[in-house]
From Swiss-Prot:
This is Somatoliberin. Keywords: Amidation, Secreted, Signal. Belongs to the glucagon family. Residues 20-30, 77-106 form a propeptide. The keyword Signal applies. The modification Leucine amide is found at L74. The lineage of its organism: Eukaryota, Metazoa, Chordata, Craniata, Vertebrata. The keyword Secreted applies. The gene is GHRH. One of its GO terms (cellular component) is extracellular space.
Amino acid sequence: MLLWVFFLVTLTLSSGSHGSLPSQPLRIPRYADAIFTNSYRKVLGQLSARKLLQDIMNRQQGERNQEQGAKVRLGRQVDGVWTDQQQMALESTLVSLLQERRNSQG
C-alpha cells in the first residue's frame, strides 16, 4: 500500500510540472525574443510609413514642377505673341515711312 501511495505522489508531482509555466531560464529568452519582434515590427511599420510619405511628397513636388513648367511655357508663348505683334507693328510702321519717303521724293 505504501508503494502505491509513493507511486501516486510521484506521478502527481511529475505530471503537475508539465502543466506549469516553463522554468525561469526558458522564459527569459522567449520574452526577449518577443520584445525584439515587437520592436522590429514597429520599426518596419515606421519605415514603410516614412517611405509612403516620401512617395506622396515626391508626387506632389513633381506636380508642382509640372505646373510651374506649364506657367513658364505659357509665359513664353505670351511673350512670343507680344513680340510678334510688336515686330509686325514696327515693320508696318517702317513700310509706311518708306512709302511716304518715296512718295515725297518722287
